[in-house]
């Protein structure tokens, strides 16, 4: 297995990326996994990586967060992201992982690697934390804000395959994000999508409201990119606010500091439950090879989890199984 890594994408690149790669490989010292670390060769060699499974591939430029995605992919052919994507396209690597520009990664996936035949629109699918610790896959969170019912059906199938094959959930429960739990609720899109999901080769359990998204009652939630991105950003904001308020209150007096000390193990567990680092990155489903978008602010540990996610997608042949499930839907 060979993983192509964009070493220059992300807020803390290339250090966090390199350290994440080293950590990932150290956890599997005997496995035949190779990393193609793509980026500025001079900078990458300065980290003196000892593991022979890491091969540096030089790329002269970087696509930044300020670059317009389509223009950047077309003009910066020598960028770390485009070079890494071309390794996957030419079958020199099995998966692509980047913490860089999300729009550019989606564009590279679509126009360099290519789509799965029959999947019209890809979906960005992170795993959200849940109260029971299982996590829930939500797609789409921004790749396609103007989806049709047929696209949501594809998302449901892809999310179900991923939840079963990578997250190890037998017969994952799939729900449709809506403003109410009743079948007749919602707008024209959700009303058109609901009967399609009922007859799909998945375990569809009906609608779910946003307030129940992180309850752990369902394993996959399907929505269009606008609502999904709004849910993602509001959830991140709420979690940050809650943790911030708790920290302020616990540090506000001597007695509250004592209480914090007593509760430290529980608070640590709560922080771990809400931490994005534990869930890897967001899969870009619908692309002809595994593509993982690591969080832009990923530290070494978070990036190593994104590599684990890519490894599992390759091992479990998720793309092949999505293609098979898509054919089942069409029969």
From Swiss-Prot:
Q: Where in the cell is it found?
A: Cytoplasm
**Its pathway?**
Lipid metabolism; phospholipid metabolism
**Chief subcellular location:** cytoplasm
Q: What class of enzyme is it?
A: transferase
The GO terms this record gives for MF are:
phosphate:acyl-[acyl carrier protein] acyltransferase activity
Tell whether Lipid biosynthesis is among the UniProt keywords. yes
What biological-process GO terms show up in the record? fatty acid biosynthetic process; phospholipid biosynthetic process
What's the Enzyme Commission number for this chain?
2.3.1.274
Pfam families from the UniProt entry: FA_synthesis (PF02504)
Entry keywords, A to Z: Cytoplasm, Lipid biosynthesis, Lipid metabolism, Phospholipid biosynthesis, Phospholipid metabolism, Transferase
**Catalysis performed (reactions):** a fatty acyl-[ACP] + phosphate = an acyl phosphate + holo-[ACP]
Read off the InterPro entries from this record: FA_synthesis, Phospholipid_synth_PlsX-like
Q: GO cellular component annotations, sorted alphabetically?
A: cytoplasm
What is the protein's quaternary organization? Homodimer. Probably interacts with PlsY.
Briefly, what is this protein's role?
Catalyzes the reversible formation of acyl-phosphate (acyl-PO(4)) from acyl-[acyl-carrier-protein] (acyl-ACP). This enzyme utilizes acyl-ACP as fatty acyl donor, but not acyl-CoA.
Against PANTHER family, the record matches this protein to: FATTY ACID/PHOSPHOLIPID SYNTHESIS PROTEIN PLSX, PHOSPHATE ACYLTRANSFERASE
Q: Which family does it belong to?
A: Belongs to the PlsX family.
HAMAP family in the record, alphabetically? PlsX (MF_00019)
Q: What is this protein called?
A: Phosphate acyltransferase
Origin species, per record, is Exiguobacterium sibiricum (strain DSM 17290 / CCUG 55495 / CIP 109462 / JCM 13490 / 255-15)
């Amino acid at each position: 297995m060979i993983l192509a890594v964009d070493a220059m994408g992300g807020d803390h690149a290339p250090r966090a990326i390199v350290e994440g790669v080293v950590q990932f490989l150290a956890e599997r010292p005997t496995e035949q996994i190779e990393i193609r670390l793509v980026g500025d060769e001079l900078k990458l060699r300065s980290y003196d990586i000892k593991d022979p499974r890491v091969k540096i591939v030089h790329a002269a430029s970087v696509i930044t967060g300020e670059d317009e995605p389509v223009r950047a992919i077309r003009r910066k052919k020598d960028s770390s992201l485009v070079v890494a994507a071309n390794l996957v396209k030419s079958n020199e690597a099995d998966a692509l992982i980047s913490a860089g520009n999300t729009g550019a990664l989606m564009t590279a996936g679509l126009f360099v690697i290519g789509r799965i035949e029959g999947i019209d629109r890809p979906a960005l699918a992170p795993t959200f934390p849940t109260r029971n610790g299982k996590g829930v896959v939500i797609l789409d969170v921004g790749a396609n804000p103007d989806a049709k019912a047929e696209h949501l059906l594809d998302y449901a199938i892809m999310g179900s395959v991923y939840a079963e094959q990578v997250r190890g959930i037998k017969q994952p429960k799939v729900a449709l994000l809506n403003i109410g739990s009743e079948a007749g609720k919602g707008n024209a899109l959700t009303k058109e999508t609901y009967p399609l999901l009922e007859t799909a080769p998945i375990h569809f359990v009906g609608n779910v409201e946003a307030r129940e998204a992180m309850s752990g009652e369902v394993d996959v939630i399907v929505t269009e990119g606008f609502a999904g991105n709004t849910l993602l950003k509001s959830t991140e904001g709420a979690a940050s606010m809650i943790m911030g308020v708790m920290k302020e209150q616990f540090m506000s007096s001597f007695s509250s500091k004592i209480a914090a000390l007593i509760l430290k193990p529980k608070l640590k567990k709560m922080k771990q439950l809400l931490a994005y680092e534990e869930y890897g990155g967001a899969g870009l489903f619908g692309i002809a090879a595994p593509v993982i978008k690591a969080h832009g602010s990923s530290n070494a540990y978070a990036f190593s989890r994104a590599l684990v996610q890519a490894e599992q997608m390759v091992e479990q042949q998720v793309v092949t199984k999505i293609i098979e499930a898509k054919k089942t839907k069409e029969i």
